[in-house]
Amino acid sequence: MIENRPWLTIFSHTMLILGIAVILFPLYVAFVAATLDKQAVYAAPMTLIPGTHLLENIHNIWVNGVGTNSAPFWRMLLNSFVMAFSITLGKITVSMLSAFAIVWFRFPLRNLFFWMIFITLMLPVEVRIFPTVEVIANLQMLDSYAGLTLPLMASATATFLFRQFFMTLPDELVEAARIDGASPMRFFCDIVFPLSKTNLAALFVITFIYGWNQYLWPLLIITDVDLGTTVAGIKGMIATGEGTTEWNSVMVAMLLTLIPPVVIVLVMQRAFVRGLVDSEK
């Protein structure tokens, strides 16, 4: 029997509320700054009461972009969505098929191939990124959606998670499919894929946010302003040297950039949690 301790309940709830406040307060300050004009943002101290310029600030960056040499912000959002969705679809497809082959196909050195994939997790991004840029440049894929997305579609982490889940499926499923005369791809499409839906949901959320938050890769690959992404665009809004940063516009851009991943997480929240639990079994 679990002993009821009121003081422990009060303490845990207090810490939870404090944690939520610490997380939400910066977002509230960003929201307030997004509703102010330029003069009010630079007032010391800045007011914590929302202003009346939110729609004006949104319209300004939505139409005019985030700088003097910038695409409209709606275009950046579209580029980020195309990049994130393409990376997500590619990662899931490549990882599922590679894990399926490693688990159920019997071929020489299959475990060696898996560990060769897995060991790439130990290589820092800085070690891999410049050779990858060189390859993309040689393939003439700079300033293109293909250059933005293709190099990021392979994932050792996703392959590992799918492999662990596939190994929990009983061998009787394979035998039953073989007796029925099902081909490997028929077995994959009719049995393995439907059983992997919760894992797919979890990896969809993770990989979408991963693709959406990319900063360094677009910065190295893209010079065409019409292919710019939101994260790199926000960084470009912050002035250097003697320039002045329009922090109200920066905060508007940041809040608009937050909306798609937040919506994805909220919509797929339950499936995301189930997928993580199933992957750990």
From Swiss-Prot:
| Organism (species) | Escherichia coli (strain K12)
Q: Supply one GO CC term from the record.
A: ATP-binding cassette (ABC) transporter complex, substrate-binding subunit-containing
Which family, according to the similarity comment?
Answer: Belongs to the binding-protein-dependent transport system permease family. UgpAE subfamily.
UniProt keywords, alphabetically: Cell inner membrane, Cell membrane, Membrane, Transmembrane, Transmembrane helix, Transport
Subcellular compartments:
Cell inner membrane
The disruption phenotype is: Mutant lacking this gene fails to grow on both glycerol-3-phosphate and glycerol-2-phosphate.
One family name in Pfam for this protein: BPD_transp_1
Q: Which GO terms describe its biological process?
A: glycerol-3-phosphate transmembrane transport
> Does the UniProt entry include the keyword Cell membrane?
yes
UniProt main location, coarse: membrane
**Taxonomic lineage of this organism?**
Bacteria, Pseudomonadati, Pseudomonadota, Gammaproteobacteria, Enterobacterales
Q: Which GO terms fall under molecular function for this chain's record?
A: glycerol-3-phosphate transmembrane transporter activity
Q: How does it assemble?
A: The complex is composed of two ATP-binding proteins (UgpC), two transmembrane proteins (UgpA and UgpE) and a solute-binding protein (UgpB).
Q: Transmembrane segments in this chain: where?
A: 16-36, 85-105, 113-133, 142-162, 202-222, 247-267
Q: What does this protein do?
A: Part of the ABC transporter complex UgpBAEC involved in sn-glycerol-3-phosphate (G3P) import. Probably responsible for the translocation of the substrate across the membrane. Can also transport glycerophosphoryl diesters, which are hydrolyzed to G3P and alcohol during transport. The G3P moiety can be detected in the cytoplasm whereas the corresponding alcohol is usually found in the culture medium.
Q: Tell me the ranges covered by the ABC transmembrane type-1 domain, including all copies.
A: 77-268
Q: Which Gene3D superfamilies match?
A: MetI-like
Name of the molecule in the record: sn-glycerol-3-phosphate transport system permease protein UgpE
- Membrane topology for this entry? Multi-pass membrane protein
CDD domains per record: TM_PBP2 (cd06261)
Q: What induces it?
A: Induced by phosphate starvation, via PhoB. Also induced by carbon starvation, via the cAMP receptor protein (CRP).
